[in-house]
Regions:
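Bacterial carbohydrate/catabolite-sensing allosteric modules
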Residues: 1-75, 83-134
Length: 134
């Protein structure tokens, strides 16, 4: 993606610090690491941002301490309703990546948040086309 015309964003909170973003992203999967790298590249280009990274069990890594830290937003992979609830408890704007499909209805707790959903069918077709063309 070309970012022609965009300017470096120097956002500051009321306390004067840059955006403090909670990242709830598992890193064992190469795809998730690529997504994380994309987020970090964007932050480097348009930041500065401060990050708090959670890669495993939420409670063990301090998701409850986001208010103490001054978290201003979150980007999260969530696989269960409990994970969604834990992230929403931070009470900050959230971008959910591939949330559970069962939580995507109009009355869902996710209905007021940005959700990025992979199109697995399109990915599969693209992979099949690639190999069929060889």
């Amino acid at each position: 993606m070309k970012n022609e015309g965009r300017k470096r964003c120097r956002l500051r909170s009321a306390s004067g610090h840059p955006p403090r973003v909670l990242l709830v992203i598992p890193t064992a999967n190469i795809i998730h690491r690529h997504i994380l790298n994309g987020i970090l590249r964007y932050a480097h280009q348009y930041g500065p941002w401060e990050f708090h990274m959670i890669t495993g069990l939420f409670e063990e890594q301090g998701i409850r301490r986001t208010k103490e830290w001054g978290c201003t937003g979150a980007i999260a992979f969530t696989e269960t309703k409990a994970h969604v609830s834990a992230v929403l408890a931070a009470a900050v704007p959230v971008i959910f990546i591939n949330p559970p499909g069962t939580l995507m209805g109009a009355k869902s707790p996710l209905s007021h948040h940005c959700c990025v959903i992979r199109d697995h069918g399109a990915v599969g077709r693209s992979a099949a086309d690639y190999f069929l063309d060889r």
